[in-house]
């Protein structure tokens, strides 16, 4: 109990100190009661005040927290094993996590892994390379090829492209790649989500800005992460809704 007078010759604590201690105790009790979900969601100017896991895997038993290195390792291992190739050592990761990433949500294809967003602010604007992509976008393509092998790609061309996409499309800047999974079937959608999860897990390393697939999008500009509904422009067909392809683009940077 806080002393109401001098104890052992010490002066009485100022009233504001007593009130501050009481408020801290109340705040701590509230956080314990409401759980880690609230603590993980508190942000100050884009930073985590009480940080939760960097990445979250949704399972039937509840959410599983992963750090970014675990998410990168797990998504890479899943992709390589599905190709019948040797995967990196995943001893420190629960086998159930790997199985959940492989199978995806029960019932229908969809997202079950997300990571917090983080967008670098010190990047310089880049010119097109010979492929029609910027160097950052080329790094994404090379990294995908290393893990997923040859894919059906589009949305860029040598010299750049100037039509076929929305007016402000990052495709015109050479910053975007489309990876096709046609026709639109549940199996192809599940394959698309395996790639999408891998991209999100590696987004910080590769300066990825957006991943769009299957009516959903992830953004590096949203610090809390998560997948969000993508509102496709009219006429809202399979292409515009990104049902038949994963769209990934990289951060643009500022003029040097």
Language-model regions, residue ranges each:
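N-terminal secretion targeting segments of exported proteins
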Residues: 1-90
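Extended, low-complexity, intrinsically disordered C-terminal regulatory tails
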Residues: 65-106, 130-166, 212, 219-222
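Second-shell loop/turn segments in exported
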Residues: 122-134, 166, 180-189, 235
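Short glycine-biased active-site loop of nucleotidyltransferases that positions the nucleotide triphosphate
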Residues: 165-172, 238-240
């Amino acid at each position: 109990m806080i002393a109401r007078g001098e104890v052992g010759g010490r002066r009485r604590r100022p009233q504001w100190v007593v009130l501050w201690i009481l408020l801290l105790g109340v705040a701590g009790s509230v956080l314990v009661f409401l759980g880690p979900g609230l603590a993980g969601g508190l942000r100050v100017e884009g930073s985590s005040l009480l940080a939760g896991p960097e990445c979250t895997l949704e399972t039937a038993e509840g959410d599983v927290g992963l750090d970014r290195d675990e998410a990168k390792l797990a998504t890479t291992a899943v992709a390589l094993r599905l190709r019948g190739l040797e995967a990196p050592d995943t001893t420190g990761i629960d086998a159930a996590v790997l199985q959940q990433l492989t199978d995806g949500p029960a019932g229908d294809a969809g997202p079950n892994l997300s990571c917090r967003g983080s967008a670098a602010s010190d990047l310089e604007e880049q010119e097109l390379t010979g492929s029609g992509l910027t160097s950052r976008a080329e790094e994404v393509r090379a990294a995908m090829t290393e893990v997923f092998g040859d894919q059906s790609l589009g949305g860029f061309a040598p010299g750049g492209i100037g039509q076929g996409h929305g007016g402000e499309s990052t495709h015109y800047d050479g910053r975007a790649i489309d990876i096709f999974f046609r026709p639109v079937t549940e199996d192809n959608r599940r394959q698309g989500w395996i790639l999408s999860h891998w991209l999100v897990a590696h987004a910080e390393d590769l300066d990825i800005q957006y991943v769009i697939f299957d009516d959903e999008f992830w953004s590096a500009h949203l610090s809390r992460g998560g997948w969000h509904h993508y509102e496709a422009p009219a006429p809202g067909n399979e292409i515009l809704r990104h049902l038949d392809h994963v769209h990934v683009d990289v951060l643009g940077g500022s003029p040097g």
